[in-house]
């Protein structure tokens, strides 16, 4: 199945419960393949429900799962490439070349033709997010598990990735903070989630100083 993209897509979409009412010939093909796999591997009748809300069409789970299927087919030694013996430029190159199947060139959702047709590839910004939130953390965990001392190399990799953009980072920027790389933004995201969101101002050097200054202004 790792060498059959149609079956991989059928497996992903079928386990999401999206193939039960096919509306075109491609969906019918995926549905047949999923029923075959379901019988062959005695798959449990469990359905996962990826979310579409608040996502841009290019980020829809339909597109991302197709790209994931393509990645599995094209890279049979994925763990070694991404985690065990990573070559960062090579990873970027293969991710940049990755695309969804032809069906999604003129679709975002099943059975609905899009107004604009284009090959669905990964954007540079999305590839950066994969490094920040997936590839580098897994590399760190793997090296810690195997007592390897390459943590500094991973930290340097974060320094070489541009800062990500999200609403939390935007709030920090509105306060005058300037970010040069993703190592800095990750530190401030940790700060927000660990202290600010949990209202642990007194346990935070920054929060404590702000409260201290506020108290001095009152007096």
Q: Where are the language model's segments positioned?
A:
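Hydrophobic, aromatic-lined core segments that form the binding pocket/scaffold
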Residues: 1-185
